[in-house]
Amino acid sequence: MDYTTKNIINFDLDGDNKKEKLFVISNVFTTESPKDIFNFIFVVKDNNISILKKDIETYDKMYNMCQAYVAYLVDLTGNGTYEIITGCGYYSNKEQCIEMYQLKNKKYQKVISCEDE
């Protein structure tokens, strides 16, 4: 399978001195013709998976989708845990979609959404 994005970020997101794995996997804008087009962003900690972003569409909707990426990891609140700011870029010149996820009760939750704009 052809991925247009596959990144793994090793980073201590929650301040426990252990690095979590943050995965970004996408096949949006692939040169192949897969049945489905997808974006996934997820965190793996202690063999548990927390999905932040999951978009799946049929191939014919590929150019209506955006390609997900991690834009920033930043501790905005100063509490030692990092917010995850993601972006999603379109093939055309549409505006980028920016979302933010924050660690609450040991799970990342979306606190700023593209739908909020």
Language model features: what each stretch is:
Residues M1-E117:
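Beta-propeller-forming repeat regions
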